[in-house]
Amino acid sequence: MEALVYTFLLIGTLGIIFFAIFFREPPRMVK
């Protein structure tokens, strides 16, 4: 069970970092 918790925390941390960078520096998407 601990492995599941650690995996969840790892994904959550990576998600927070990703969104922080994403919103701080908006991507330049060209349609």
From Swiss-Prot:
Q: GO biological process annotations for this chain's record?
A: photosynthesis
Could you list the residue ranges that cross the membrane?
3-23
- The answer, when asked if Transmembrane helix is one of the entry's keywords, is yes
Where in or outside the cell it occurs: the entry states: Plastid, Chloroplast thylakoid membrane
Q: How does it sit in the membrane?
A: Single-pass membrane protein
Any one cellular component term from GO for this entry?
photosystem II reaction center
Main localization of the protein described in the UniProt heading: plastid
Q: Where is the signal peptide?
A: none
Chloroplast is among the record's keywords: yes
**InterPro entries named among the record's database cross-references:** PSII_PsbT, PSII_PsbT_sf
Q: Which UniProt keywords apply?
A: Chloroplast, Membrane, Photosynthesis, Photosystem II, Plastid, Thylakoid, Transmembrane, Transmembrane helix
Identify one Pfam family in the record.
Answer: PsbT
Q: How is the subunit organization of this protein annotated in UniProt? A: PSII is composed of 1 copy each of membrane proteins PsbA, PsbB, PsbC, PsbD, PsbE, PsbF, PsbH, PsbI, PsbJ, PsbK, PsbL, PsbM, PsbT, PsbY, PsbZ, Psb30/Ycf12, at least 3 peripheral proteins of the oxygen-evolving complex and a large number of cofactors. It forms dimeric complexes.
The role this protein plays is: Found at the monomer-monomer interface of the photosystem II (PS II) dimer, plays a role in assembly and dimerization of PSII. PSII is a light-driven water plastoquinone oxidoreductase, using light energy to abstract electrons from H(2)O, generating a proton gradient subsequently used for ATP formation.
- Membership in a protein family: Belongs to the PsbT family.
**Protein known as:** Photosystem II reaction center protein T
Quick one: which gene encodes this?
A: psbT
